[in-house]
Amino acid sequence: IALLQTLRTRIRDAKRVATVAEFGPRFLHSTGQTYKGGPNSGVFTQITSQDAADLPVPGEKYSFGVVKASQARGDFDVLAERGRRALRVHITGDLAAGLQTLSAAIIAAV
């Protein structure tokens, strides 16, 4: 979380834009509706990763990880369908290392 907040403030300061870091799926309904239905003024980066541990949904053939990934994919698809500027990054393997690599690339770009 600290790395994402640092990255967020670096982008804010470099580009002089408002930034926010949110974690799903809890944000998907409330703030997600604003992003998908409000003015086309945002730029979005959706970061997903494999769960370190996954649990099966009782009585189903799929897991909670599959449900979470489906929610993220659906949210991204709606942003894309509405013409929002959005990038999805899926990190596999070591999450901390992947976030460090992503952070370094974004900082170099801004």
Residue ranges and their predicted role:
Residues 1-110:
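Phosphate-moiety recognition in structured ligand-binding domains
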